[in-house]
Amino acid sequence: MKKNYSIRESVFIKDSLNNSFMLFKDNNENLLFNKINIDNSSMIIDKDIMDFSATIDENNRLHLLYLNKSGELIYCTYSENAWHKNLIGRLDIQSNMYKYLTLLIHKNTINIFYATANIINLNLWTIEHIVKNIDNWQKHVVTNIFSDKTLDPFYIDQDEFGNIYLVYSGKESVHYNVYYLFFNTFNKKWAPNPTKISSSFVDNILPYIFVDTQNNVHILWYCSNNGEYLLKYKRFSSIGEDKFHWREIKLPKITGSNSHALMLEKYNRLNILYAERNEIYNLVSNDHGNSWILEDKTSIVNHPLYLVQYYNLSLNRLRHKINHYYGSIDKASISFYCDDFHEDLKEFNEFKAASLKGEKDSVKDDIKDSINLEEKENKAKSQAPKADKKGHKTNQR
């Protein structure tokens, strides 16, 4: 499977007042912040950015974490139309690589995650977890991962109590496997040993984890099968016959993707989104993941495709939960595939497009009027009586 590392990442945040914000890196590695449906203003937060992550807390405060090319790990909060920056520390980017910054907040606890490896040995990666409670920072080594020089992204999620769940893929002997780990928020400890989710006899890559509104844990990944890659799915339930056991559930045949399949919950129905052959497909389950049907699909209209870190405080948390969406960003406008939550964004994008068209038409009319005026002046000059050498006007026929 050819992994699509060209997919770009961004962050979309909607607060409880329906104000929408977007953060993303441009082609010059500037970190941009847009207030989408407020005044459509855009600002550069910082330049030469290596990686970033952002979120919002229950009090509508935006939080941002980013690493720049000077090795500065900077933590920011947004208030009074400004980002307030604090230097957490300096990372040794000359000797080490740092990837997949992830910021997670539960109540007053700040969680920071990243993967790191020494540039001399990029086959051994470590996931580290930094926790802040009040004024104290504490670092945990979550796990070590054997991999090739490129490491698949890890993903995390949390339940309503603040327990954290993590999934990653690592190399065991000659094959890649998918592993799961759990952080207990009450004793502040990670499980000592990861749980293997996949088979050891084939390659398993691109894992994704999702915790639904009922605190059930779901993992998606791709598994090699006779030259193809099939989407696999397991669920860890907190209730029912399979309580506290991992159960594999059969999906319709979904082959060879080069990007992560995503899971989300809308109207208490689980959805699986995946990209394939220039289209986004949407599978739906009405029975908590036991069975799945294809509900719709839509063409990818703009490239690159964006994997959007998604937060929306305006949604009913008892019925909806979305961590990521696939989307499109065009001139500071954002849209989401297989989406029915953002009529305000659609209206704003349509209004913006109409405004731009109006401006273009106005410019065209101004140019046309200028050309017509110039043509009239030239015609008038050509029809005016000419003077002879003595300065007398002569009539032309």
Cite the ranges covered by each PLM segment.
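Extracellular, repeat-based ectodomains that mediate carbohydrate processing or recognition
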Residues: M1-R397
